């Protein structure tokens, strides 16, 4: 029998490799060697380190759109580690959006892709990031196991 749980942790970005796929207007801005189109989309290959009750690493492939104002993002992440003492791996589907100030996303656990103690886990996490932080970002996961 499954029970509802809520747990939390923090994550930091350990690598970010972003490349433009489409620059609609040919107008981009370069920041720290990365090009960001005014309108278009890119792919970012990213790794995260998690700590707290969610501990481990994540490898993410993002598709990020750029548009003045609201712009959607999506991606898939393979998480390996421990959630509330359950060791294994699972896959999150990231669905979100961003603007000039904030990134918002819901991370859905993809059913059927878990291993070990995380096999059979269902649920979702939410994140809202305002600006860059070297100290990491909070994540709260609601799950059933």
Model-predicted segments: where are they?
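Beta-strand-enriched cores of mature, soluble protein domains
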Residues: 2-145
